[in-house]
Protein backbone atom coordinates (compact mmCIF):
# COMPACT_ATOMS: atom_id res chain seq x y z
CA UNK A 1 0.00 0.00 0.00
CA UNK A 2 0.97 3.64 -0.34
CA UNK A 3 2.57 4.23 3.05
CA UNK A 4 1.33 1.10 4.80
CA UNK A 5 4.00 -1.22 3.46
CA UNK A 6 3.48 -4.90 2.67
CA UNK A 7 0.39 -6.83 3.76
CA UNK A 8 -0.71 -10.36 2.93
CA UNK A 9 -4.18 -11.86 2.70
CA UNK A 10 -4.90 -15.56 3.17
CA UNK A 11 -8.06 -16.40 1.18
CA UNK A 12 -8.57 -19.65 3.12
CA UNK A 13 -8.54 -18.10 6.60
CA UNK A 14 -9.70 -14.68 5.33
CA UNK A 15 -7.10 -13.02 7.52
CA UNK A 16 -4.70 -10.18 6.81
CA UNK A 17 -1.12 -10.06 8.05
CA UNK A 18 0.92 -6.85 8.22
CA UNK A 19 4.73 -6.74 8.05
CA UNK A 20 5.89 -4.07 10.55
CA UNK A 21 9.35 -3.91 8.94
CA UNK A 22 7.71 -2.29 5.89
CA UNK A 23 5.56 0.25 7.77
CA UNK A 24 5.51 3.67 6.05
CA UNK A 25 7.00 2.17 2.87
CA UNK A 26 5.27 3.32 -0.31
CA UNK A 27 5.07 0.12 -2.31
CA UNK A 28 4.88 0.74 -6.05
CA UNK A 29 5.22 -2.81 -7.38
CA UNK A 30 5.59 -6.46 -6.30
CA UNK A 31 6.58 -9.54 -8.30
CA UNK A 32 7.82 -13.11 -7.69
CA UNK A 33 11.59 -13.54 -7.44
CA UNK A 34 13.23 -16.76 -6.26
CA UNK A 35 11.49 -19.53 -4.25
CA UNK A 36 10.26 -18.02 -0.99
CA UNK A 37 11.25 -14.48 -1.98
CA UNK A 38 9.56 -11.49 -3.60
CA UNK A 39 10.91 -8.38 -5.27
CA UNK A 40 9.33 -5.16 -4.04
CA UNK A 41 9.77 -1.67 -5.47
CA UNK A 42 9.51 1.16 -2.95
CA UNK A 43 8.94 4.74 -4.07
CA UNK A 44 12.12 6.85 -3.76
CA UNK A 45 13.93 4.00 -1.96
CA UNK A 46 14.62 1.38 -4.60
CA UNK A 47 14.04 -2.33 -5.17
CA UNK A 48 14.38 -4.87 -2.37
CA UNK A 49 14.38 -8.65 -1.96
CA UNK A 50 11.61 -9.41 0.54
CA UNK A 51 11.23 -12.58 2.59
CA UNK A 52 7.54 -13.09 3.55
CA UNK A 53 8.48 -15.74 6.12
CA UNK A 54 10.64 -13.37 8.17
CA UNK A 55 9.56 -9.91 6.99
CA UNK A 56 13.18 -9.04 6.20
CA UNK A 57 14.11 -6.96 3.16
CA UNK A 58 17.51 -6.43 1.53
CA UNK A 59 18.46 -3.90 -1.17
CA UNK A 60 18.67 -5.15 -4.75
CA UNK A 61 20.92 -3.24 -7.17
CA UNK A 62 19.63 -2.58 -10.68
CA UNK A 63 22.64 -3.03 -13.02
CA UNK A 64 25.09 -0.92 -10.93
CA UNK A 65 25.08 1.79 -8.27
CA UNK A 66 24.88 4.65 -10.79
CA UNK A 67 21.92 3.13 -12.64
CA UNK A 68 20.22 2.20 -9.39
CA UNK A 69 20.50 5.77 -8.04
CA UNK A 70 19.22 7.27 -11.30
CA UNK A 71 16.18 5.00 -11.42
CA UNK A 72 15.23 4.82 -7.76
CA UNK A 73 16.16 8.07 -6.04
CA UNK A 74 14.81 10.79 -8.29
CA UNK A 75 11.13 10.85 -7.49
CA UNK A 76 10.07 7.97 -9.75
CA UNK A 77 9.16 4.37 -9.10
CA UNK A 78 10.47 1.29 -10.89
CA UNK A 79 7.70 -1.12 -11.86
CA UNK A 80 8.30 -4.88 -11.90
CA UNK A 81 6.93 -7.70 -14.05
CA UNK A 82 7.94 -11.35 -14.41
CA UNK A 83 7.60 -11.67 -18.17
CA UNK A 84 8.91 -15.24 -18.51
CA UNK A 85 9.67 -18.04 -16.01
CA UNK A 86 13.34 -17.06 -16.34
CA UNK A 87 13.28 -13.26 -16.45
CA UNK A 88 11.96 -10.14 -14.72
CA UNK A 89 11.44 -6.72 -16.27
CA UNK A 90 12.47 -3.59 -14.40
CA UNK A 91 10.53 -0.74 -15.97
CA UNK A 92 12.26 2.62 -15.60
CA UNK A 93 13.74 5.03 -18.14
CA UNK A 94 14.28 1.92 -20.27
CA UNK A 95 13.21 -1.72 -20.06
CA UNK A 96 15.81 -3.66 -18.07
CA UNK A 97 15.53 -7.43 -18.44
CA UNK A 98 16.99 -9.48 -15.58
CA UNK A 99 17.95 -13.10 -16.21
CA UNK A 100 17.18 -15.04 -13.03
CA UNK A 101 19.55 -17.91 -13.79
CA UNK A 102 22.54 -15.88 -14.97
CA UNK A 103 21.81 -12.91 -12.65
CA UNK A 104 22.54 -10.46 -15.48
CA UNK A 105 20.79 -7.42 -16.94
CA UNK A 106 20.13 -6.51 -20.58
CA UNK A 107 18.44 -3.33 -21.80
CA UNK A 108 15.71 -3.87 -24.41
CA UNK A 109 16.57 -2.59 -27.89
CA UNK A 110 14.40 0.45 -28.66
CA UNK A 111 13.32 1.92 -31.98
CA UNK A 112 15.49 4.79 -33.16
CA UNK A 113 14.00 8.14 -32.21
CA UNK A 114 11.49 6.56 -29.84
CA UNK A 115 11.49 8.29 -26.46
CA UNK A 116 9.84 6.76 -23.40
CA UNK A 117 7.60 9.40 -21.83
CA UNK A 118 6.67 9.17 -18.17
CA UNK A 119 6.42 5.99 -16.13
CA UNK A 120 6.42 2.57 -17.82
CA UNK A 121 3.59 0.32 -16.66
CA UNK A 122 3.05 -3.39 -17.40
CA UNK A 123 -0.09 -4.42 -19.31
CA UNK A 124 0.63 -8.15 -19.38
CA UNK A 125 2.25 -11.15 -21.03
CA UNK A 126 0.74 -12.94 -24.03
CA UNK A 127 2.66 -15.86 -25.54
CA UNK A 128 6.04 -14.55 -26.72
CA UNK A 129 5.21 -10.89 -26.17
CA UNK A 130 4.91 -8.50 -23.25
CA UNK A 131 2.87 -5.31 -23.53
CA UNK A 132 3.82 -2.12 -21.71
CA UNK A 133 2.61 1.47 -21.77
CA UNK A 134 3.83 4.92 -20.87
CA UNK A 135 1.76 8.12 -20.89
CA UNK A 136 1.84 8.35 -24.69
CA UNK A 137 2.46 4.88 -26.15
CA UNK A 138 1.65 1.18 -26.05
CA UNK A 139 4.74 -0.96 -26.61
CA UNK A 140 5.27 -4.57 -27.61
CA UNK A 141 8.35 -6.34 -26.26
CA UNK A 142 9.44 -9.49 -28.11
CA UNK A 143 10.60 -11.75 -25.27
CA UNK A 144 12.74 -13.79 -27.67
CA UNK A 145 14.75 -10.93 -29.21
CA UNK A 146 14.36 -8.35 -26.39
CA UNK A 147 13.25 -5.75 -28.96
CA UNK A 148 10.77 -3.03 -28.01
CA UNK A 149 8.50 -1.37 -30.57
CA UNK A 150 5.64 1.11 -30.29
CA UNK A 151 2.26 -0.27 -31.40
CA UNK A 152 0.21 2.82 -30.61
CA UNK A 153 0.89 6.51 -30.03
CA UNK A 154 -1.61 9.08 -28.85
CA UNK A 155 -1.60 12.58 -30.25
CA UNK A 156 -1.52 16.12 -28.95
CA UNK A 157 -2.62 16.50 -25.33
CA UNK A 158 -4.11 13.01 -24.89
CA UNK A 159 -2.59 11.21 -21.89
CA UNK A 160 -2.77 7.45 -21.24
CA UNK A 161 -3.66 6.64 -17.63
CA UNK A 162 -4.39 2.91 -17.93
CA UNK A 163 -4.38 0.14 -20.56
CA UNK A 164 -5.80 -3.39 -20.63
CA UNK A 165 -5.93 -6.07 -23.35
CA UNK A 166 -9.11 -8.06 -23.94
CA UNK A 167 -9.60 -11.70 -24.91
CA UNK A 168 -9.55 -10.79 -28.63
CA UNK A 169 -6.19 -9.02 -28.35
CA UNK A 170 -7.67 -5.53 -28.59
CA UNK A 171 -6.45 -2.73 -26.35
CA UNK A 172 -8.70 -0.57 -24.21
CA UNK A 173 -7.16 2.71 -23.16
CA UNK A 174 -8.26 4.87 -20.26
CA UNK A 175 -7.25 8.44 -21.05
CA UNK A 176 -7.85 12.00 -19.91
CA UNK A 177 -10.50 12.12 -22.68
CA UNK A 178 -12.27 8.89 -21.72
CA UNK A 179 -12.34 5.39 -23.22
CA UNK A 180 -10.42 4.55 -26.40
CA UNK A 181 -10.50 1.23 -28.28
CA UNK A 182 -7.47 0.24 -30.36
CA UNK A 183 -7.50 -2.66 -32.84
CA UNK A 184 -3.86 -3.71 -33.45
CA UNK A 185 -4.78 -5.77 -36.53
CA UNK A 186 -6.37 -2.90 -38.45
CA UNK A 187 -4.49 -0.18 -36.52
CA UNK A 188 -7.71 1.72 -35.96
CA UNK A 189 -8.63 3.63 -32.82
CA UNK A 190 -12.11 4.65 -31.67
CA UNK A 191 -13.07 7.05 -28.91
CA UNK A 192 -16.15 5.64 -27.15
CA UNK A 193 -18.57 8.54 -26.56
CA UNK A 194 -20.29 8.76 -23.17
CA UNK A 195 -21.70 11.40 -20.88
CA UNK A 196 -21.22 9.19 -17.79
CA UNK A 197 -17.62 10.18 -17.09
CA UNK A 198 -14.66 12.17 -18.35
CA UNK A 199 -11.13 11.19 -17.42
CA UNK A 200 -10.50 7.52 -16.61
CA UNK A 201 -8.26 6.67 -13.67
CA UNK A 202 -7.98 2.90 -14.13
CA UNK A 203 -9.49 0.13 -16.26
CA UNK A 204 -9.23 -3.64 -16.62
CA UNK A 205 -10.65 -6.19 -19.07
CA UNK A 206 -12.20 -9.22 -17.34
CA UNK A 207 -11.58 -11.47 -20.41
CA UNK A 208 -15.33 -12.15 -20.47
CA UNK A 209 -16.60 -9.33 -22.64
CA UNK A 210 -16.45 -6.45 -20.18
CA UNK A 211 -14.14 -3.52 -19.55
CA UNK A 212 -14.31 -2.37 -15.93
CA UNK A 213 -13.65 1.34 -15.57
CA UNK A 214 -12.78 3.49 -12.58
CA UNK A 215 -13.62 7.15 -13.16
CA UNK A 216 -14.84 10.09 -11.08
CA UNK A 217 -14.75 7.91 -7.92
CA UNK A 218 -17.27 5.52 -9.52
CA UNK A 219 -17.16 2.09 -11.17
CA UNK A 220 -18.52 1.47 -14.68
CA UNK A 221 -18.63 -1.53 -17.03
CA UNK A 222 -18.45 -1.32 -20.83
CA UNK A 223 -20.05 -4.31 -22.57
CA UNK A 224 -17.84 -4.88 -25.59
CA UNK A 225 -20.18 -6.83 -27.92
CA UNK A 226 -23.33 -4.97 -26.93
CA UNK A 227 -21.50 -1.60 -27.12
What does each model-identified segment do?
Residues 1-227:
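Carboxylate-rich, polar loop motifs that coordinate divalent cations or form catalytic acidic clusters
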Amino acid sequence: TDGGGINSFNPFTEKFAHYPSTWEDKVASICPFTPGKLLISLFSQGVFIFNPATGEKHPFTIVDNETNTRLCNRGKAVNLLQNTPHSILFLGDHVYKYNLKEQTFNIATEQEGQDIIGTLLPIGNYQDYTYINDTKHIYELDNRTNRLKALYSCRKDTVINSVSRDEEGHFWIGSNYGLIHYHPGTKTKTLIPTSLFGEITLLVCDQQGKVWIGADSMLFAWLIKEK
